[in-house]
Amino acid sequence: MSLVSYPRSESESDIEEETPLASKSFDPTLFQHARRKLSVDSTKKSPKRLKRQVDLQKSSFNDKTFNESDVISNERFKSNDLLELLPAPKNQAELAPKSSKRSDLDLNENYLLPNNSVSDLTSTGSSETVKKSTYSEKSGNVSLFNIVGSESKQASLVDSDQKPYQPILIKPKARANPPKLRNQPENDFISIANHSVHSNAEDINIINEDYIEIGRHRKEKGRIIDVDINKLPKPTQEALPSAPTIKSVAPGRHQLSSLVEMAISQKDNFEAYFEQQRSNKKASSQKYGF
């Protein structure tokens, strides 16, 4: 297989397609699923369709010097359009452009092509360029985001006979039967009896001694008790013997001699502390049974 591809002429490719295979010693049933060989006539259109297109081009050109051979030769080398490849619309519906949501443009008028554009369409062979040109000519000075309108639209909106704006205010409606106000006389009031703590106590039949304990009796004096602070009973925690204080050893390295001296100096405190712990243990065992 060569890596270099040489260009071939159109005559050579046609000859190669039409020449039959040299060897016919193979079984034809083995190649049932092979690709079908394209013939030259398969790209041609039907005569009825070709004749119809020639008539359309004749009516569009309106020229006496019209050669059918040029149209036929162009149709042979022309590729299939997208509309020819797609299936026909359902119920023969017309494929019209969708209506635009914009209020400042009228696309239906822009899509209508003039009579002169038919000849341009057949000569160029593309309808999109004609639509774009007519759309740009008819649209004029149109803003992209509809912020500033065209001059013609602004002139049409302004009317000389237009009346000035008068705001309409919604007024509350008057009631058919308004509520009547009653005039209250000056002497029309309810007398309230004077209630006090003493009157309430008499109603409940509370003794004066109980009343003094419940609340203050303004007419009678309360009981005054002289208390000596120094003779007050001490709490139970203070009555218990206090535990001897033992100095703790400071953190860090220490010599053995310094630790022994500290323990000897606090010998009495250690003995008192151990004795207190034993007595607490005996008292708790007698009280709680363990």
Curated annotation (Swiss-Prot):
Ranges annotated as biased composition (Polar residues): 114-128
Coarse class of the protein's main subcellular location: nucleus
GO BP, one annotated term: mRNA cis splicing, via spliceosome
Region called Disordered, residue ranges: 1-61, 114-134
Source organism superkingdom: Eukaryota
Keywords, comma-separated and alphabetical: mRNA processing, mRNA splicing, Nucleus
Keyword set includes DNA-binding: no
Keyword Nucleus assigned: yes
InterPro entries: PRCC
Pfam families: PRCC
Subcellular compartments: Nucleus
Cellular compartments per GO CC: nucleus; spliceosomal complex
Subunit structure, interactors included: Belongs to the 40S cdc5-associated complex (or cwf complex), a spliceosome sub-complex reminiscent of a late-stage spliceosome composed of the U2, U5 and U6 snRNAs and at least brr2, cdc5, cwf2/prp3, cwf3/syf1, cwf4/syf3, cwf5/ecm2, spp42/cwf6, cwf7/spf27, cwf8, cwf9, cwf10, cwf11, cwf12, prp45/cwf13, cwf14, cwf15, cwf16, cwf17, cwf18, cwf19, cwf20, cwf21, cwf22, cwf23, cwf24, cwf25, cwf26, cyp7/cwf27, cwf28, cwf29/ist3, lea1, msl1, prp5/cwf1, prp10, prp12/sap130, prp17, prp22, sap61, sap62, sap114, sap145, slu7, smb1, smd1, smd3, smf1, smg1 and syf2.
Its biological purpose: Involved in mRNA splicing where it associates with cdc5 and the other cwf proteins as part of the spliceosome.
Protein name: Pre-mRNA-splicing factor cwf20
Organism: Schizosaccharomyces pombe (strain 972 / ATCC 24843) (Fission yeast)
Gene, per the UniProt record: cwf20
